[in-house]
Amino acid sequence: MTIIDSIGGATAPSYSVLLEGPESTVCAEAPIAAHDSTAYQSEAELEDELIAQLVEQGYEYADITDEAALIANLRARIERLNGFAFTDPDWERFFRTHVAAETDGIVEKTRRIQQAPVIDFTLDDGTIRNVMLLDRDHIYRNSLQVLNQYATSAGAHDNRYDVTILVNGLPLVHIELKRRGVELRQAFDQIERYQRESFWSGTGLFEYV
């Protein structure tokens, strides 16, 4: 797969366009190779290999299978990043108003991460805290985790996600794996289907993807 910058004006051979945006285009570069049984990998094997590589690079594997565990992990990671512990009422209010507000969608959540990852939050005791969702100045303080096969049944349809990267507990990256011989476009279609059917479900944390 090649990402071709559409602004640069460079010409390229005729490729099959998968996705096209205002600043970049994703194309399929190489034709599907002839099947080689000795090199065949199932999607499960690809998934295991990817996770093993990420763990070797310092990612922590997170055994998270439901939203309650996802939220509990998010709280722990944000508390560790900021060096203090929320009381339960403070966390509930922070989560519901600044992380997973019912009125927020993909645009608002993307803007929060991209433009305002530090939130001024007043605790119940009157103390004002600058709560970071992401530390841009000291990137190695951020927590990186990987989880797989997260299942959701609260959306329009039941879905199970291949691999998710958590940054400080927030699901920011989704990876959909396809075995050799399957068109790459199918992975993009599947992610788009998740956006329609289930990323918004529950508290909508997967809308941060």
Region roles according to the model:
Residues 2-209:
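An alpha-helical interface "stripe"
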